[in-house]
């Protein structure tokens, strides 16, 4: 990175840096393999792996065979086993992909850095729950929400064309093209789609493809939204790598005073707020139904012209916030009217006014959580707790810690839900399932377990000091305030699984 920065300071085009020779540096594969070790439970020292199983000469041969583009490209699994040295061909191919991602990220990071540094209004947050206060502030003032599912079935040449804009190293582009085409033409036709969808097993190469694709998508889309919007402000937020939330406030255009108020109402475009997390995007608009349909039409045209994608209509859903709910980040989102009574006393007169405001009501899918618990054998489908037989071989501390971790993650993720009474029913299921698991392990009853452990069962597991929303139950539903927990870096796995099911509908 420092060397590339020096070349850039010498007025050399940094896009022309030769990245391909870096692929033949042995240290690069050590970095890629070390990164793979961090993500797995494999604990063998790296030097042992390099000395016993790693053959740098084999990696060079694999790269040459990939570039030849013959009928026995190594990624298809037809490589000569004699060329492998105590290591199968798939592992070497994955190592090459990881190393190619490491090299490409150097150029990609240098490209995106000036773009982010040039925007002084960007603010970064590490919690995904910074998104919910943003939505709580903006959604009540809008009336339509457009649920966008970013297309991922994209032709390899479109990706290569995207990479050519910021990577002008021809050998690296040829290698990337060969890998993408072979991936597409292999026996599994969904390989490339799996590489672009943020789901399942995430490799460095798949995340690099997805981030570069979404970066290109948003670098074109957001300026178009800014240009088409004549509102006073445009706000957008997204998560590039699942951990960063960016919010931008930019003043665009102010209408001239010569235009009358009625003409302003006819000419003014809707307020547009753009939000994204992984493959889900939300366009929140304030306008008429005709304007929202026009926005949807232009999005389809944008996909066709920029990425040659003919997306299906189900990729963009339009919901009216006052009538329908939209699922996002494991919540059901809706906007409801909230009546307020304002009393103002002036001298001897008392004025009482009734005001109606809108408020965001995020709802946790309690019934879906119970179904997931039934699938994992914590309860039956009706919600009656049962013992977790698979955990009876663990120690008491491990059992308590596991139940405590499940409750803590769920409680933190759904801390801002409007139906928090349902969370305490989830707590009851986990608490009783924990007691039944311990009773089954010791071949006793729940009463005996409670007498032996005493308060430890309820203090070590489901610690009360973590629960900061209990005071909200003393209030009425109209006075309840939403408390968002700000220390969550990614979506809860259970909520993520439920969200994927909603995406397929």
UniProtKB/Swiss-Prot annotation:
Keywords: Chloroplast, mRNA processing, Plastid, RNA-binding, tRNA processing. It is found in: Plastid, Chloroplast. InterPro entries: Domain_X (IPR024937), Maturase_MatK (IPR002866), Maturase_MatK_N (IPR024942). GO terms for molecular function: RNA binding. Pfam families: Intron_maturas2 (PF01348), MatK_N (PF01824). GO terms for biological process: mRNA processing; RNA splicing; tRNA processing. One of its GO terms (cellular component) is chloroplast. PANTHER family: MATURASE K (PTHR34811:SF1). Belongs to the intron maturase 2 family. MatK subfamily. Usually encoded in the trnK tRNA gene intron. Probably assists in splicing its own and other chloroplast group II introns. This is Maturase K. It comes from Sciadopitys verticillata (Japanese umbrella-pine). The gene is matK.
